[in-house]
Amino acid sequence: MRNQALLNDGGTPLYSLYEIAGFTDGTMPGHDWYDTFMNDAASMQRYNVNISGGNNRVKYLVNAGYLHQNSLIDAEKNDNYNPALKLHRFNILANVDVTLHRYLNCFLNTNVTIDRINQGYNGTGDIMNSIYQMAPTVPGPITEDGKVITAEYNEYPTYGLINRSGYSHQTGINLNVAYGMNLDLGFLTKGLSVKGIVGYEANYDGTIYGSTDYARYAANGSGLFGTHTTLPLSLSKTANMRYFINFQGFINYNRIFGGKHEVDAFVSYFNENMMKNGDLPYDRLSLMGHVKYGYDSRYYIQGDFTYDGTEQFKPGNRFKFFPTVSAA
């Protein structure tokens, strides 16, 4: 059927009459390459520790976690490197809330995640594509003395993609910190409060690549296939880092008068700065406002606006005003 499909598309048949006869009488290999290169299941381990407590003035929460996950792809470790896909993830979360005064409280939230990912040099998509391209009649995947076998139509056999092409080792670090204070101004007028938050986020992504090539041997036993030769590992490294700093300020007012008149309003200010190695900085400013009036929990009218801008646009056209009004 595969031969016929190729012929219908104007291609060349994949299997010769000799291979078809050999596959029928059992003299030709009949590999299930998916079963050869894929595991039935992949293990995953997850551990978490939580600590929380406090009193009327101070409350805290600490969570530490570890995750280890293996891959469904069946890779083989060699003397120089391990191409098996493995994920190690560590994360720590720490939150503290402090009541400084009857009207004033603050918080500090911190979250750190570290990922370490080891895998082969080639991606999962390339490997899966190779598995489905390999004909079941191809012997191997390696000879008794460890030589990689391939077919004429497949320059990159699955075994070589997984085990003989190299590796990559990636480290990712993500840090998030937020500090905020909330002041209840109810002593001035009921329902009025102000809030400020300073946030910081930093991301690091670094990868070490070890790439190599390997000799291929023809499935028909004629010797070397193509011009590929076995090469020593070639190492390279990439690293990227970026950070965000933002400030948010809010003035909130929420109050009900006479049991039927509801007023909800706020004004907020947002400022964000981003830096990334090799790129120009990015700045954004936003001023937002919202006011809503409700009567008897049935009729509402609401107005909102955003005054938003960034230095990414040309001078004189960096800020825009976006108003909206609705009623129900």
Q: Residue spans of the language-model regions?
A:
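Structural signature of Gram-negative outer-membrane beta-barrels, strongest in the C-terminal barrel
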Residues: T99-H101, L235-Q248, N254-A328
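Membrane-embedded beta-strand positions of outer-membrane beta-barrel proteins
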Residues: V62, L108, Y179, V194-G196, ...
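Structural signature of outer-membrane beta-barrel channels/translocons
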Residues: S52-N56, G65, D97-T99, Y103-N105, ...
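Extracellular loop and loop/strand-boundary signature of outer-membrane beta-barrel proteins
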Residues: Y34-F37, N78-N82, N95, I162-S168, ...
